[in-house]
């Protein structure tokens, strides 16, 4: 048995909503392969369960898949603040986030996280940086 087979046999199912979002992302968006998928999503959810953050910063929302997975792992009162710099993503992403089962745990913000996140005045307990890879050092 390969490691991939082992992981797939031992993680939670993706769920219908995330499956439909992943499918729509790959069918409707030009760079659909950039989306986090089942394995990455379940890992993010597990990490949130383990770390138990109150406020999560996500840089790079894209389709919202990873934001939903992060929010699934949050305890009551927790929040994911997810930033997408590309305003052309909003028409696709916002409805998926707002109609998700964890919509109340996600704040979707169009803008540059580097300048906008500090304006929120929030102490983040966890960050998932999946935006512009060329600026990772500046972002951190």
Enumerate the language-model features and the residues they cover:
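A short alpha-helical cap/connector motif
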Residues: 1-126, 133-140
